[in-house]
Amino acid sequence: MGLGVLLATLAAPAAAMTFMTVEYVCPVGGERFSASTMGSGTVFGHFLDGRAHGAIQSPWPLVECPGNGFLLFRETFGKAELEALGAYVQSDDYQRLRTTETSYWRLAQLLRVIDAPAVEQAGALQRASWQASRAQYPRYVAAASAAFARQCPDGETARDGQWLYCQMLLGEWERRLSRFEPARARFNALLPQVAALVTGPDRERVARQYAAEIAQQLELIDAGDSRSTMAVDANAPAAAAAGPAPGSAADAASAADASASPVEMVAGTTADAASMAADAAADAAREANADALAGEGDR
């Protein structure tokens, strides 16, 4: 390593997002190509819909085969899966999606083709909503809401922390679409359940964050505010003494990150970039249901 490179590396800020060029072989069609791939990122906070905020792209960018547009979301596929994916990717329908839809919306369609678990498809749709344009947003949220509602039905009797956070996402999407009264009713019903539903070694911290976010949602609803909003950080040092403050990018490790709900997306600061890209995309599809921070980046 040259001295200039070494000095530049040593001087790089801790909150870094890095990219590197990686060689790939497309699982569908065998095309060889290189792509700029995100290798690391740092999270400072999260939005109420789970999208990470910081020196990171959220959702984690998917690598795309330039020829046919296949998205690399797993390291390996079964023979039947490759046959089904190959036929779909070559179809006019999929090629049309390349010009009209986001990468995670297309990922959701690929997951549907191979009959992936419903939680994987739901996670892809959640991330698609983070990418959506103003025109796409209502349609994307409607699809994500329907997928998540099947994972955490309102009438579910076996409730836990994952059910709670999934319900919080449904309320967030209702608010974002200006459906304020259903959102208000949902959050008012959820708030008294937080302490009982959140379990685990970090339950006090997680429950405090969930309760703060629900209170924040109710304030936004009272104000008729449907905008995308940073979540409060109920566990920041100042918040511990003064209570919840307006949403800020203060503490990367926030509530639902510790709740172990299956929406976590991996993005460490050091890793082989090719493996990182494949793992991150696979985790985005595989582990999706509900983690308020969506776990992307350094902690």
Can you describe what each PLM-predicted range is?
Residues 9-13:
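N-terminal signal peptide c-region/cleavage motif recognized by signal peptidases
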Residues 15-89:
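N-terminal cysteine/histidine-rich coordination modules
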